[in-house]
Amino acid sequence: MAYPAQMGFQDATSPIMEELLYFHDHTLMIVFMISSLVLYTISLMLTTSLTHTNTMNAQEVETVWTILPAIICILIALPSLRILYMMDEINNPSLTIKTMGHQWYWTYEYTDYENMTFDSYMTSTNDLTPGELRLLEVDNRMVLPTELPIRVLVSSEDVLHSWTVPSLGLKTDAIPGRLNQTTLMASRPGLYYGQCSEICGANHSFMPIVLELIPLKYFEKWLLTML
C-alpha cells in the first residue's frame, strides 16, 4: 500500500517484487559509485593545475576505461536477465484468470470454473464508505488465494491498457487481439491496489485494480458463494 509523500517502493508482496527491489538497490549502488567517481574526477580537475598536457599515449588508462564499463554492464545485465526469466516462468499454475481491459473498466474471468465472470468498475466518490480510498476502490474485487502460483492472461477489447499492481511487481500490457500472460504468487493476505498504466482515453485515471488475497480455505468458501 502506498502512503502520502512516500519516496520509495511499496512493500513487496511476492517473490518477484522482492527480486526487483534487490535489483533496484544493486543498480542504484553501481550508479552511486560511478557518480562519486565522476564528481571526484571533476573536483580534481578544478582544484589542481593542469598536468600531462602533452601526453600523446596512455595505454593503461585506455585499457581501464574499456574493461571497467564492460564489467559494470555485466554486473547489471546478469541479475536483470535472471529476473526477466523468472517473470516469464510459469510452472503448473493452480489457477488461471483472464483479464480483459475495456474503456474504462476491467473484466475478470476465472477460466477454471463455468460462468465465473464479472466486471470491475471504479466506485464513485459518492458511494464510498469511511476508510475507503478515493479513485482506488471498485465494486467487484479480484479475489485470489495466497501462496499459490496463479497465471493471469491479459488482453483488451478496444484500445491499449496496462494491468499493473506495484506491490506484486506486476505490469502487463493489454493489447487488442493479443493475449499476454504473467504470473503471481502472493506471500501474505491483504488488499492490493493498482491502476491502468497505459493512457487509454478520457477516463484512463478511473480504471483501478483491487486484488483481495486471502488464504485458500476462505477462497474456496468465496467460490461457493459465486458459483
UniProtKB/Swiss-Prot annotation:
CDD domains: CcO_II_C. Binds a dinuclear copper A center per subunit. Component of the cytochrome c oxidase, the last enzyme in the mitochondrial electron transport chain which drives oxidative phosphorylation. The respiratory chain contains 3 multisubunit complexes succinate dehydrogenase (complex II, CII), ubiquinol-cytochrome c oxidoreductase (cytochrome b-c1 complex, complex III, CIII) and cytochrome c oxidase (complex IV, CIV), that cooperate to transfer electrons derived from NADH and succinate to molecular oxygen, creating an electrochemical gradient over the inner membrane that drives transmembrane transport and the ATP synthase. Cu cation A2 binds at C196, E198, C200, H204. Mg(2+) binds at E198. One of its GO terms (biological process) is ATP synthesis coupled electron transport. NCBIfam families: CoxB. Its cofactor is Cu cation. Component of the cytochrome c oxidase (complex IV, CIV), a multisubunit enzyme composed of 14 subunits. The complex is composed of a catalytic core of 3 subunits MT-CO1, MT-CO2 and MT-CO3, encoded in the mitochondrial DNA, and 11 supernumerary subunits COX4I, COX5A, COX5B, COX6A, COX6B, COX6C, COX7A, COX7B, COX7C, COX8 and NDUFA4, which are encoded in the nuclear genome. Its EC number is 7.1.1.9. It is found in: Mitochondrion inner membrane. It catalyses: 4 Fe(II)-[cytochrome c] + O2 + 8 H(+)(in) = 4 Fe(III)-[cytochrome c] + 2 H2O + 4 H(+)(out). The keyword Chaperone does not apply. InterPro entries: CcO_II, CcO_II-like_C, CcO_II_C, Copper_CuA, Cupredoxin, Cyt_c_oxidase_su2, Cyt_c_oxidase_su2_TM_dom, Cyt_c_oxidase_su2_TM_sf. The modification Phosphotyrosine is found at Y218. Belongs to the cytochrome c oxidase subunit 2 family. This is Cytochrome c oxidase subunit 2.
